[in-house]
From Swiss-Prot:
GO cellular component, one term: cytoplasm
Species for this entry: Natronomonas pharaonis (strain ATCC 35678 / DSM 2160 / CIP 103997 / JCM 8858 / NBRC 14720 / NCIMB 2260 / Gabara)
Principal location class: cytoplasm
Cofactor note text: Binds 1 zinc ion per subunit.
Superkingdom in the source lineage: Archaea
The name this protein goes by in its record: Threonine--tRNA ligase
Listed SMART domains: tRNA_SAD
Keyword annotations: Aminoacyl-tRNA synthetase, ATP-binding, Cytoplasm, Ligase, Metal-binding, Nucleotide-binding, Protein biosynthesis, RNA-binding, tRNA-binding, Zinc
Gene that specifies this protein: thrS
UniProt binding sites for Zn(2+): C334, H385, H510
SUPFAM superfamilies, per database record: Class II aaRS ABD-related, Class II aaRS and biotin synthetases, TGS-like, ThrRS/AlaRS common domain
Length: 642
């Protein structure tokens, strides 16, 4: 039998016989690792420990100490849910039940479920877990699989699509129950330490609104009860911080039915925050020599065909028939920027050319996937596109990486970095992709950053460096990105004249410092619980006159000393206590209480939103501090602490 080379995470290599399994490799490394093996990651794909290796590959062994273990555990918990459901409701038909970032779900039909049903199903799940049934992989012929699912159109659809080339097909069994599944799974149901069913929602088969409506049951699972309890506490805190709730309470944005789903309206408070975010990155771009451009919201589809978006992205585009000609709302800004570049005659002396645009784009997400600002139809990207010579790639990407770090550090956000490689659906040659991936890997290596490889997660036109940042609740969010593109310059025939007086092809770099304003805004709302840093807050100071007699002094303070800031006067005839509480509820960073004593002395009493207070403060002293706090973009108001 032929030999294959298996590359391990530390770079070491093992020669194994073709057909060896993941578990075989683990035992070759050591008997203890072999005993502990749960699954494997082969070339970035999570697989069963019985997966046979037939070609040279990169392999990560998964044990119960691995990051991937929880994903495997939750996949098994989804099977336990499905078994429990069918024990209690044999008429239920199963669709799909994958693990998710926070747990798992299973789409089912043929049964009406409510909260009481979930309680009973959860109790049955506990029975199955306590029984500690072995979970075993089994192979069935296609004919047998179709017989098993004679009355289940969803499993038959899977057999006819994803599993169309498989014979035999993979099943997993536990006790007397089985499910069509690629795995992997833990060894027995008893490994699942704690489960909880969370909620019920509606879903469409394949995410297509034209298909049948299914019932989606969400749940989660952990190794221990304490881990589950911690998750549930964080989940409750997340509900309190939900940006949809705070967006309404703080009058930041709305998505009314009349406008359509996924189409947010920004109120003055929300737009004030967005303008600060825009000004911040615009200044960073200006400092690095970017030129600001603007492109229309729609183009002829000829442009999208030229760019490759029509071929690769048409299902996610909004298309319009205008005078018998097809147009498309732009899902990305890059083709417009490439077209602008193509209008000029460029020399190597002109490069790099850097374009920036806060450009609105439109992507047709399924209605069921839309959620607040996190998934919308219309959103704005702080897009930057650079056209550079090949030998300038690393220098430019390093500058972009510095910009991204400055943005995330400004908001005190921890982050992780990943190199996303070629997806299955892509444009361009193998040579071009390999060159692009090598360039980005070189940048990451020289930066000294720790980074992961996300195989197959690149854009269809090139590999990318992705930043994921962590919020106050420990959740990870997709954020800034840097993408190399050797393909679009080819498609648009972009050229510049080199030092040798010959035409050359520039490299295009795509870059976003936030990712999208909508998602970044959403994360900031929840990360800060609406308590934005003073420089970002829609209302930075609220002046609270003790009585109507002090309103004139309040206006004088606002107009003479604080006219450069976002300041409001609370002039309603309320008690001071109610005025303070209202300002606190509105998350205003600073409150200035002014009564007869302050007016006579020409001072203010300063309170911050943490209910700390300083009395008899000179107005100019407060103003100067406020100016420096805003200029330095400090995360917390800190005047009272000085």
């Amino acid at each position: 039998m032929s030999e294959i080379v298996v590359t391990l995470p530390d770079g070491s290599e093992l020669e194994m016989e073709s057909g060896s399994t993941v578990e075989d490799v683990a035992y070759e490394i050591g008997p203890g690792l072999g005993d502990d093996t749960v699954a494997g990651v082969v070339d970035g794909e999570l697989v069963d420990k019985a997966e046979q290796l037939t070609d040279d590959c990169e392999l990560v062994i998964v044990t119960d100490q691995s990051d991937e273990y929880l994903q495997v555990l939750r996949h098994s918990a989804a099977h336990v849910f499905a078994q429990a459901l069918q024990r209690l409701h044999p008429e239920a038909k199963l669709a799909i039940g994958p693990p998710t970032e926070e747990g798992f779900y299973y789409d089912v039909t043929g049964v009406d479920l409510d909260a009481d049903d979930l309680e009973a199903i959860e109790a049955e799940m506990e029975t199955i877990i306590e029984a500690d049934h072995d979970i075993e992989r089994a192979e069935r012929s296609r004919e047998e699989a179709f017989e098993i699912y004679e009355d289940n159109p969803y499993k038959r659809d899977i057999l006819e699509t994803e599993a169309a080339d498989e014979d035999p097909v993979s099943f997993y069994t536990q006790d007397d129950w089985q499910d069509l599944c690629q795995g992997p799974h833990v060894d027995s149901t008893g490994e699942i330490g704690a489960v909880e069913l969370l909620n019920i929602a509606a879903a469409y088969w394949r995410g297509d609104e034209d298909n049948e409506t299914l019932t989606r049951v969400y749940g989660t699972a952990f190794e221990s009860e304490s881990d589950l309890e911690g998750f549930l506490q964080r989940r409750e805190e997340a509900k309190k911080r939900d940006h949809r709730k705070l967006g309404q309470e703080l009058d930041l944005f709305s998505i009314p039915d009349v406008t359509g789903p996924g189409l947010p309206l920004y109120h003055p408070n929300g737009k004030a925050v967005l303008r600060e975010l825009e000004d911040f990155v615009d200044q960073l771009n200006d400092d690095q020599g970017y030129e600001f451009v603007e492109t229309p919201h729609l183009f002829r589809t000829e442009l999208w065909k030229q760019s490759g978006h029509y071929e690769n992205y048409v299902d996610d585009m909004f298309l319009l028939d205008v005078n018998d000609e097809e147009y498309g709302l732009k899902p990305m800004n890059c083709p417009g920027h490439a077209t602008i570049f193509n209008q000029g005659n460029w020399s190597y002396r002109d490069l790099p050319v850097r374009y920036a645009e806060n450009g609105k784009v439109y992507r047709k997400e399924q209605r069921g996937e839309l959620s607040g600002l996190s998934r919308v139809w219309a959103f704005t990207i702080d897009d930057g596109h650079l056209f550079v010579e090949r030998d300038a790639i690393e220098q430019e990407v390093n500058v972009i990486m510095d910009q991204i770090e400055e943005v995330l550090d400004t908001f005190d956000l921890d982050y992780e970095v990943a190199l996303a490689t070629r997806p299955e659906k892509s444009v361009g040659s193998d040579e071009i992709w390999e060159q692009a991936q090598t360039q980005l890997r070189s940048v990451l290596e020289s930066s000294g950053m720790d980074y992961d490889i996300e195989s197959g997660d690149g854009a269809f036109y090139g590999p990318k460096i992705d930043f994921a940042f962590e919020d106050a609740l420990g959740r990870n969010w997709d954020g800034p990105t840097v993408q190399l593109d050797f393909n679009m310059p080819e498609r648009f025939d972009l050229t510049y004249t080199g030092e040798d007086n010959e035409e050359h092809r520039p490299v295009m770099i795509h870059r976003a410092l936030y990712g999208s304003y909508e998602r970044f805004f959403m994360v900031l709302i929840e990360h800060f619980d609406g308590n934005f840093p003073t420089w970002l807050a829609p209302e930075q100071v609220r002046i609270l006159p003790v009585s109507d007699d002090n309103i004139g002094y309040a206006k004088q303070l606002k107009n003479r000393y604080l006219d450069d800031f976002r300041v409001e006067i609370e002039d309603r005839s309320w008690t001071v206590g109610k005025k303070i509480q209202t300002a606190h509820d509105d998350r205003v960073p600073y409150m200035l209480v002014v009564g007869d004593n302050e007016e006579e002395a020409g001072t203010v009493s300063v309170r911050d939103r943490f209910e700390d207070e300083r009395k008899d403060v000179d107005v100019e002293t407060f103003r100067d501090h406020l100016a420096s706090e805003v200029e330095e973009k400090r995360v917390e108001p800190d005047f009272v602490d000085e």
